[in-house]
Swiss-Prot record:
It catalyses: 7-aminomethyl-7-carbaguanosine(34) in tRNA + S-adenosyl-L-methionine = epoxyqueuosine(34) in tRNA + adenine + L-methionine + 2 H(+). Pathway: tRNA modification; tRNA-queuosine biosynthesis. Coiled coil: none annotated. It comes from Clostridium perfringens (strain SM101 / Type A). It is found in: Cytoplasm. Belongs to the QueA family. Keywords: Cytoplasm, Queuosine biosynthesis, S-adenosyl-L-methionine, Transferase. One of its GO terms (biological process) is queuosine biosynthetic process. It comes from the Bacteria. It is an enzyme of class 2 (transferase). This is S-adenosylmethionine:tRNA ribosyltransferase-isomerase.
Length: 341
């Protein structure tokens, strides 16, 4: 299977540069994975497609303001760090721009010295391991000095930081938002619960590998980045009861899907578990837990379009995406939504 099999022509003006004023006013394409039939709705209409006893699985990760702009302590030369993941304590793996300035032992300062970073080592891919020095609580310092790490295809400034967070975000640790969840409002979640639909939570901290292009020709040769996940006992039991009752598990986002499929066993059960996953889901994969999926519209030739193709069928997805382009749906992080039923 070739990566080019997942290519489609996307006009740049369809890449959403800002979120809509109302989260649940985005468009919703409903795709029947059995027939390939397409409906055009509004996101709030998702309520009509959820049944009593179903379980909606949300990723409650919270995006860190992981972009730090500072200067070299000795010379004042500008540097930009993008935090990727915490290694341990105050040590973080990050991207440095320009990399040539970030030599081992170099000290950088941020916010007039409120935060300092020392480069401890350089990784295989050129990523830096840095150690922070500061007074107080790191998360508070980062909230004050850090900026939101918006995806590379968004060029507009984000006026409100919270619009790149889901309304249920809780566990800090992501370098990017689980964007399928951006469409939900607190009112809509209440309406969903009132209908008798269960809501389960898990955590997967989204890494920047999400935006890395696939650099091989053959899909089988691609190696995924690893991301940290956690599912607790209470939510695992809720998901298992749903499967036992013959009801549907509906994942919100590719991150929730990858977590559930990492943990799920051959009998369609999950258990309390934490760890790192590098699961790569593409056509031919048999889903163990996820029945349906709410997701955004993804980049051509990305691992995410491969995942949705595994669930809905490659022909169905490519047809749906070409229809979305024709109907001028908004794409990517701040774009419209798809429900694979």
């Amino acid at each position: 299977m070739k990566v080019s099999d997942f290519y489609f022509e996307l006009p740049e003006e369809l890449i959403a540069q800002y979120p809509l004023e109302k989260r649940d006013s985005s468009r919703l394409m409903v795709l029947d994975k059995k027939t390939g039939e397409i409906e055009h709705r509004k996101f709030h209409d998702i309520l009509e497609y959820l049944n009593e006893g179903d379980t909606l699985v949300l990723n409650n990760t919270r995006v860190l303001p992981a972009r730090l702009i500072g200067e070299k302590e000795e010379t004042g030369g500008k540097i930009e760090f993008l935090l990727l993941k915490r290694i341990e304590g105050d040590k973080w793996e990050c991207l440095a721009k320009p990399g040539r300035k970030a030599k081992v032992g170099t000290v950088f300062t941020f916010g007039e010295g409120k935060l300092k970073a020392i480069v401890r080592e350089i990784g295989e891919e050129g990523n830096r391991i840095i150690e922070f020095k500061y007074d107080g609580i790191f998360e508070q310092v980062l909230d004050e000095l850090g900026q939101m790490p918006l995806p590379p295809y968004i060029h507009e400034k984000l006026e409100d930081k919270e619009r790149y967070q889901t309304v249920y975000s809780k566990e800090k640790g992501s370098a990017a938002a689980p964007t399928a969840g951006l469409h939900f409002t607190e009112d809509l979640l209440k309406e969903i619960k009132d209908k008798g639909v269960n809501i389960a939570y898990l955590t997967l901290h989204v890494g920047l590998g999400t935006f890395r292009p696939v650099k091989v020709d053959d899909v089988n040769n691609h190696v995924m980045h690893s991301e940290y996940y956690h599912l607790d006992k209470e939510n695992a039991e809720l998901i298992n009861k749903t499967k036992e009752a013959g009801k549907r598990v509906i994942a919100v986002g590719t991150t929730s899907s990858r977590t559930l499929e990492t943990i799920g066993d051959e009998n369609g059960r999950v258990r309390e578990q934490s760890g790192w996953t590098d699961i790569f889901i593409y056509p031919g994969y048999k889903f163990k837990i996820v029945d349906n999926l709410i997701t955004n519209f993804h980049l051509p030739e990305s691992t995410l379009i491969m995942l949705v193709s595994a669930l809905a069928g490659q022909d169905n997805i490519m047809n749906a995406y070409n229809t979305a382009v024709k109907e001028k749906y908004r794409f990517f992080s701040f774009g419209d939504s798809m429900f694979i039923k």
